Amino acid sequence: MGLRNVGLLTLLFFLFYACSDDDTSGDTNPDLDSDVIRSINVRLNPTGYAPLNALIDLETLEAVSVEITVVGREGSTSNITRSFPGTATSFELEVFGLYANYNNTLELTLFDGSGVVLENREVTVETPPLIADMPQISIDVPTNTSELEFNLVNYFGFSQNFRPQRPFIFDQFGDIRWYLNFTSHPELSDLFFDNGMTQLRNGNFLFGNAATRSIYEIDLFGRIVDSWSLQGNGFHHHVIEKPDGNLLVTINDASKSTVEDVVIEIDRATGEFINTWDLNNSLDNSRRGWPTDLADLNEDWFHANALEYSAEDDEIIVSGRTQGVVKLNQQNEVSYILAPHRDWNTSGDGTDLAQFLLTPLDANDQPITDLDVLDGTVNHPDFEWSWYQHSPILMPNGNLMIFDNGDNRNYINAGPYSRAVEYEIDEQNKTIKQVWSYGKERGSETYARIVSKVSYLSDKNSVLFTPGSSVSGGVPAGKVIEVDYGTKSVLFEATINPPNTIFNISFHNVLRVSLLD
């Protein structure tokens, strides 16, 4: 029979494709004593970029199907098992999820076409230690789930050299099960991905690289699957995939004296820019309602740090760290502005921006008319604005959740605290109601002046709250906190301590990586 590439896209730990550039490690044609297996060969880190991945070449004497278990060292919950339908005699199996500095055990079970077990076989794979750039991970609140869960960390820590940035995935036991090291990569050796990687629907990863001014799709072995040039413009901060496959990207427009204030849509198939949102036109680039010591506002007046796409009305939501959150239609016209009401005047195209400001409602759905609350000088018992925010996300109910960093809160650095906050927005009536929040009760412990993210985990009705630049006891640390949406009880909490950081940033964000269907 011909070669069968066994696709493991439904589990993070196994994917399509093989590579011949590798280091052999583990059992290589051992004394098999088998009536089924002709040969087994294990190649560790076949691309050179994913040290905890391996490739298994398996040849059999008759047609079989295969089940593989990566045996976890924290009991059965930490196992990764996958069964493969269909039969063949020649396989290339890619394995993801090995432990570093460990003699890993892989259990292979071979079945005939009727599902009868023909043979069980153990294969061992010895791995090197983690590189020195990886952090210490402590589990502060262990999860009680019986499912193996994975957290993708868009990491800013390092030992000696910040670049290339090195994303990693750790499980709920605090073990790093995957990471990328592009130090020897011909194109990504100076990787700066800012917001970092997101997982595409096909299981691959999407990110931008400021060093090459390009967007990339890679697989879990670090192989470039596709790329898109930004045509001389700079990348900063975020790229997301639309439902139709096209890409939305925040860029530095090379033709402008300002930065981080333009969004483009890239046709995924052709690489063409098919739409541009220039915030200099839709907003007021002279507004200085939110001052900062982290940027020159004459150049970096908006600081676009995150995007969200609203499929319901084909509009985009853009977070500007020093302005607020704005929703724009395809013609670059403002639908609403989520920000305190201070100093909103006329846009670059001459439009009065005050008409797009949202009026907060109290718990009884009555408008809050206190001018100090509208201005942001004080908070209302039922409502607070978000400040210098990141990570706007649309929830299944249509509400907007934001990571409210809380920098310069109430213009006096009140707090300090950061929040995950959910707002219900009525675009027609231009009202906003705060319906849920978490983080204020944690105070300075989870305060992150910059970066950070929130995610809503619909399968568990929980929120992942990840302050990435918090400081604990004077030592930079990031927190990964999962809270129950209904009770706000902490379901899981981990602390990430890198050896070194830039601007006290441990990570830009953390994503709960899903198993694919």
Regions found by a protein language model. Name each.
Residues 13-44:
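Bacterial Sec-dependent N-terminal signal peptides
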Residues 9, 17-22, 91, 174:
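N-terminal processing/targeting junctions
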Residues 1-17:
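Sec-dependent bacterial lipoprotein signal peptides
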Residues 38-55, 60-66, 70, 92, ...:
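Histidine-/acidic-rich catalytic cores in large beta-rich domains
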Residues 86-94:
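Aromatic sugar-binding surface patches on proteins
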